[in-house]
Amino acid sequence: MRNLLEQIQGRLDELNKAERKVAEVILLNPQQATRFSIAALAQAAKVSEPTVNRFCRSFGVSGYPELKLQLAQSLASGAAYVSRAVEADDDPAAYTQKIFASAIASLDSACQQLDPQQVSRAVDMMIQARQIHFFGLGASAPVALDAQHKFFRFNLAVSAHADVLMQRMLASVAHTGDLFVIISYTGRTRELVEVARLARENGASVLGLTAAGSPLANACSLSLHIPLPEDTDIYMPMTSRIIQLTVLDVLATGMTLRRGVDFQPHLRKIKESLNASRYPIEDDDLN
């Protein structure tokens, strides 16, 4: 179950303008928010005190005192994702620490919320597939390419595509036995949702790596719901790709274990095929 900070971060887009101001003040400095009075929070967010109370009730708490208690519990858990935005005056030490802390906390949060039964079902879909297409757009496009690099090792027909027209054409000729893995941070990209629906209409299975409750998640046969809180207003998504790549590693590991020890020589052969393309470590010419 997500803690309060994660719930606030995940619902930012659902809040009205005034309530979002309250959320942004809390996420900017949750420690300080636990020390605010309701009047101080309202002033910091430039909203009225009744707006703060409505915000509290929308998250299932009776008022600001209870909200502050849950905030403190979220911070004390040690696993909460706390938004720490990079500021214009951050020095290298500050922004380095923030980026690493954000990635570590987001990975921990994703691990806790990833359903093992859903992971097992996703691995089943991949093992049973005749061929797998990985789709991604924007920041998720290189993740799809990385997936192709991982999963061709399983003696499957695997492809990756970041062009919306190619994605649509492949979905239009999909068949039973085809699996489309669609990767999207928001799950709200119209083209990807349409492709998911088209592929399913033609008998294919669709696995989504995306946000819970999103249009894409609802359009897929199965969706691995990945919480990806991050700063997206100014900076390009960073932690989203790290989590997506890690989840794909989880699925690849699941497939490897399902194939058993008899499959290991095949993987070893692929790895050893690269030896001739690399300089030996002890080569003096490289010193």
Curated annotation (Swiss-Prot):
GO BP field: carbohydrate derivative metabolic process
Domain SIS stretches: 122-261
InterPro entries, per the entry: Homeodomain-like_sf, HTH_RpiR, RpiR-like, RpiR-like_SIS, SIS_dom, SIS_dom_sf, WH-like_DNA-bd_sf
UniProt keyword Lyase, yes or no: no
GO MF annotations in UniProt: carbohydrate derivative binding; DNA-binding transcription repressor activity; transcription cis-regulatory region binding
PROSITE patterns: HTH_RPIR, SIS
Cellular component GO terms held in the UniProt record: protein-DNA complex
Keywords: DNA-binding, Repressor, Transcription, Transcription regulation
NCBIfam families according to UniProt: PRK11302.1
Protein name: HTH-type transcriptional regulator HexR
Organism from which the protein derives: Pseudomonas putida (strain ATCC 47054 / DSM 6125 / CFBP 8728 / NCIMB 11950 / KT2440)
